[in-house]
Amino acid sequence: MTVTRSQTGKTPKKLERPGYVETPGRRVTRSRVVVASETSADDVSDSATEIRGRSKSTTRRRQVKTEEASEGEEKGRANGHINGNTNGHTNGHTNGHTNGHTNGHTNGSTKKPRVIDGWVEGSDPKIDYSGEFEFGGSWGVLSMMIGFPLLMYYMWIGAVYYDGKFPRPSEGQSMSEFLAHMGHLVCEGAYPSLRAWIIYWVFFIFEALCYVLLPGVTVMGRALPHLGGKQLPYYCSGVWSFYTSIALAGVLHFTGIFKLYTIIDEFGPLLSVAIISGFLVSFVAYFSALARGAQHRMTGYHIYDFFMGAELNPRMFGILDFKMFFEVRLPWFILFFISLGAAARQYEVYGYVSGEVGFLLMAHFLYANACCKGEECIVSTWDMYYEKWGFMLIFWNLAGVPLSYCHCTIYLASHDPATYRWNRVFLVFLYAAYLFVYWVWDTTNSQKNRFRQQERGTMVSRKTFPQLPWQTLKNPKTITAADGSKILVDGWYGKARKIHYTCDLYFALNWGLITGFSSPFPWFYPIFFACMITHRALRDIQRCRNKYGEAWVEYERQVPYLFIPVSYSSS
């Protein structure tokens, strides 16, 4: 599956070339360079990269702003008045005056600077001029930094000590006694032991080495306006990293050096290590950026800036991009290995792997594999281009995604298979339906991606597994907008406008459904994701209407269905 965005049109045409992954045995010395597509409003969300479900109920993916700076106001606003600027004034200008002109007026012959993603052309990129705060500002992000780790511990306690039920005070137990008891359970069962630290960080370092040393392809990122259109190279070795990790994990398990079910046995301590690591790495990332003067779009509010991040493109050795590294290898690899560990534990205890655990193992493998085989498409996403490397990205990838989305697996691993056994006919149906929806999901995003690549002359064919039928449309039907951009009205996007969201939600619901309804915690991810994806779909629709105008109205007329051909349609 590939997931790309449209480009600006500045990329020169080039011939389609077959993709490759180099064989192991030597360090890659030459990697194909592919120019990443620019993001367009109609494909702002990618299944393999955006479904990561970060805690963004009010997601930050704002459309690139090209409106003019407002009468001397934008240039001095800087989100809380940084560097001694007061009352919204900058560079010594007062009362909203810009460039020496009074009352905020500019010379009619002088072109006003554009505001691009919080940066005013020609201004200091270290300052955020957008005037916008997400998640309720400093108080909101502080609540999230405190609340989500507590929620993770609460769900873990419920899963382990309350048989998957909500922990609540027992009869006659005061709230203070209940909270003290909860704290005792965390100290007793989730103490960050040395063994847990070694497991977590050996995996972390190993994956970093795989990122740098294994074969892959190099992809050029989107142009960065504040750097004069400079494009950064991104090295994509996810496919080799994933399969190398699986092979080594198998060797360690079968030789007895490290049994895979150790991940299940040590889940509590690993949870604490991941949470602590999320905070530690966030502190190092923030203060090292300040010390090196590498901060970008800062508001001057330290709690908020710590959460959103200080540095835009943190790198090591010129090849290891930390945002790229954290995006796939840590969250989705860990989630897959937790499911693999559950299967190993079940086989150790019962002598077989239940169909329900096998279902989750299949689902998590397909998802992690999809992220890897389309890794070159991540470089054009909003996370890589706009989001800074702060607590939001760091904590969510180190702890939030792998250790809160896994409760479906934890529930199955903690209970006898007889307690959640589905009817065998229904289970076969779940497998078949899931694989069908995966095909729709994969080919939907592939059609969108390859349409954009063909349009810009950057089509690259990679023979990564799995290659599925109907991934590429020949002479697809399109609608041309007034600005010359095209809307794909063919293939799956000729049937429903957000059909890839339908698939995403189907996956999430199945992860909960396979566990049954005895515990609420496996349903945390499906419910959270359903709320997020609904909000995102409505937001995307509005952005597309603004971008494409009458062309989008025509698209809605030709394709009236939003999610599936019988679903709600916006009008």
Curated annotation (Swiss-Prot):
The keyword Transcription does not apply. It is found in: Endoplasmic reticulum membrane. Residues 1-116 are annotated as: Disordered. It catalyses: ergosterol + NADP(+) = ergosta-5,7,22,24(28)-tetraen-3beta-ol + NADPH + H(+). Disruption phenotype: Deletion of both erg4A and erg4B results in fluffy colonies with severely impaired conidiation and increased susceptibility to antifungal azoles itraconazole and voriconazole, but does not affect virulence. The double deletion leads also to the loss of ergosterol production and accumulation of the ergosta-5,7,22,24(28)-tetraenol precursor. Induction: Expression is induced in the absence of erg4A. GO terms for molecular function: Delta24(24-1) sterol reductase activity. Glycans are attached at N107. This is Delta(24(24(1)))-sterol reductase erg4B. It comes from Aspergillus fumigatus (strain ATCC MYA-4609 / CBS 101355 / FGSC A1100 / Af293) (Neosartorya fumigata).
